[in-house]
Swiss-Prot record:
Assigned GO CC terms: cytosolic large ribosomal subunit
Taxon lineage: Bacteria, Bacillati, Cyanobacteriota, Cyanophyceae, Synechococcales
Descriptive protein name: Large ribosomal subunit protein uL18
The protein's role, per its UniProt record: This is one of the proteins that bind and probably mediate the attachment of the 5S RNA into the large ribosomal subunit, where it forms part of the central protuberance.
Organism listed in the record: Synechococcus sp. (strain WH7803)
PANTHER family reported in the protein's UniProt record: 39S RIBOSOMAL PROTEIN L18, MITOCHONDRIAL (PTHR12899), LARGE RIBOSOMAL SUBUNIT PROTEIN UL18M (PTHR12899:SF3)
């Protein structure tokens, strides 16, 4: 019996999730990708295979406000607020949350809570 690495476990969970999650034009998918140092969020219309809006810790809007010594959860909150603001500006109010195989905890949960507080419904 082989053991999977943590990254392989995440990829396996993501494949399992994606079988059931898809975004439409009415209710696109809010996909979250978490790396060791950054977090990315995209609002995706899977039917048209297009990204409607996105935000990450590498955005010019956030890079200046986030400090290198700041908390990664604080950065996730800022990304969640920014992606929600951009989605609402495009008229998107409801999304399907795709945690990307990550556990709903920590940075992923902070991003989701911030997006909800900023006005996205999921």
């Amino acid at each position: 019996m082989s053991t999977l690495s943590r990254k392989q476990q995440t990829q396996k969970r993501h494949r399992r999730l994606r079988r059931h999650l898809s975004g439409t034009a009415d209710r696109p998918r809010l996909a979250v990708f978490r790396s060791n140092s950054h977090i990315y969020a995209q609002v995706i219309d899977d039917a048209a295979q297009s990204t409607l809006c996105s935000a990450s810790t590498l955005d010019k809007d956030l890079r200046t406000s986030l400090t290198a010594t700041g908390s990664t959860c604080d950065a996730s909150v800022a990304v969640g607020e920014l992606v929600a603001k951009r989605a609402l500006a495009k008229g998107i109010q409801q999304v399907v949350f795709d945690r990307g195989g990550n556990l709903y905890h920590g940075r992923v949960k902070a991003l989701a809570d911030a997006a909800r507080e900023a006005g996205l419904q999921f």
